[in-house]
């Protein structure tokens, strides 16, 4: 397999994948194909080698097993971002925060609450990326998908995506690959509604109100930095996939039972199908504080945010999974609540 057969895409052999992920763990790929244009990406996906290849973009929401034999990886690195009539179109490999900055530079509001989230634009619809009261489902206009079963690519609408809390039809699909995403934004330059209390207070705005989008971005970045959620190479608290678990949604009865069993308030938020609990609160109150299990551990909970499982510089995937499993099991034992991993686990399970 050569680059000429893949519209010029670079092909490398025996490439360590750990440096290509924010958690910095993973195997050595037998073959790495880097597609820097949509043409190259489609060519790689249509080639026989691409049918079962692992798709990797920003590497910020994936945990790769330590050993995966005979692995071919297609690295999504197409990165063009264009703006027209309030529509931002981003190729799948575009850096997500660059998409946010581009929107703001054109006076467009709607993405600012999602500032500082690592990863690529193409990953955002897969798990309906969200933070601080916003999610990409609020603004996605359409998504261009390649179907590895048929070799076709088509634009689909949000209605086709079945967006939910940190999920979509793409999250558990091995055949649909995002090529491009379009976002329909506020041409009046208004921010998204500020639904998240901590963010609204930081901006001195009533919950549900709006603010200058640039000011919202600055406030979001400050909050994320305080939790070790903005990538910073020297800061090992940022060597993670962000929040390792999603906030669980429980029934009203479960919430009432939990509130009766603990001292003090239980952070919770209304959800369409129940009550959403703060996973970080559950983790800490199950006995897993920031920095657990201690300084000498290769994988630890972040010292800033107990929901992030971090690599302190020499962890393996096995170390990360073992810690995440301990936390999950501890929360289940303490509260009877099951935490669900937020990142995609490849070749490994909890």
Swiss-Prot record:
The record's top EC class is: oxidoreductase
GO terms of molecular function: FAD binding; UDP-N-acetylmuramate dehydrogenase activity
Using the record's annotation, list all stretches that form the FAD-binding PCMH-type domain: 25-194
Q: Say if the entry is tagged with keyword Mitochondrion.
A: no
Instruction: State its location(s).
Output: Cytoplasm
Q: Which reaction does it catalyse?
A: UDP-N-acetyl-alpha-D-muramate + NADP(+) = UDP-N-acetyl-3-O-(1-carboxyvinyl)-alpha-D-glucosamine + NADPH + H(+)
Please give the Pfam families that the UniProt record associates with this protein: FAD_binding_4, MurB_C
List the record's Gene Ontology CC terms alphabetically: cytosol
Q: Which UniProt keywords apply?
A: Cell cycle, Cell division, Cell shape, Cell wall biogenesis/degradation, Cytoplasm, FAD, Flavoprotein, NADP, Oxidoreductase, Peptidoglycan synthesis
Its required cofactor(s), as named, are:
FAD
This protein's source sits in the domain of life called Bacteria
Name the family: Belongs to the MurB family.
Functionally, this protein is described as follows: Cell wall formation.
Query: What's this protein's name?
Result: UDP-N-acetylenolpyruvoylglucosamine reductase
What's the source species' lineage? Bacteria, Bacillati, Actinomycetota, Actinomycetes, Mycobacteriales
Which gene does this sequence derive from? murB
């Amino acid at each position: 397999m050569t680059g000429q057969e893949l519209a010029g895409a670079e092909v490398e052999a025996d490439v360590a994948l750990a440096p290509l992920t924010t958690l910095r763990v993973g195997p050595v790929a037998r073959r790495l194909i880097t597609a820097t244009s949509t043409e190259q990406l489609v060519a790689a996906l249509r080639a026989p080698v691409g049918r079962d290849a692992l798709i990797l973009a920003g590497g910020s929401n994936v945990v790769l097993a330590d050993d995966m034999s005979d692995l071919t990886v297609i690295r999504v690195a197409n990165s063009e971002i264009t703006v027209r009539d309030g529509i931002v179109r981003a190729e799948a490999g575009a850096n997500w925060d660059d998409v946010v900055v581009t929107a703001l530079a054109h006076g467009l509001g709607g993405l600012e609450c999602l500032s500082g989230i690592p990863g690529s634009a193409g990953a955002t619809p897969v798990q309906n990326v969200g933070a601080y009261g916003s999610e990409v489902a609020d603004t996605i206009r359409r998504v261009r998908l390649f179907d590895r079963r048929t070799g076709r690519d088509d634009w689909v609408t949000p209605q086709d995506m079945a967006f939910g809390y940190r999920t979509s039809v793409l999250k558990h699909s091995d055949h649909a690959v995002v090529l491009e995403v379009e976002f329909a934004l506020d041409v009046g330059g208004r921010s998204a509604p500020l639904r998240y209390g901590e963010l609204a207070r930081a901006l001195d705005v009533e919950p549900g109100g709006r603010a200058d989008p640039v000011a919202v971005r600055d406030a979001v970045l400050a909050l994320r930095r305080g939790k070790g959620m903005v990538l910073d190479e020297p800061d090992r608290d940022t060597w993670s996939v962000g929040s390792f678990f999603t906030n669980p949604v429980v029934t009203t009865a479960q919430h009432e039972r939990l509130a009766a069993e603990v001292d003090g308030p239980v952070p919770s938020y209304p959800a369409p199908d129940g009550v959403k609990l703060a996973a970080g609160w559950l983790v800490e109150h199950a006995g897993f504080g920031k920095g657990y299990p201690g300084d000498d551990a290769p994988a630890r909970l972040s010292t800033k945010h107990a929901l992030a499982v971090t690599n302190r510089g020499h962890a393996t995937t096995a170390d990360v999974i073992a810690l995440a499993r301990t936390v999950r099991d501890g929360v289940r034992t303490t509260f009877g609540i099951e935490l669900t991993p937020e990142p995609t686990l490849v070749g490994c399970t909890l």
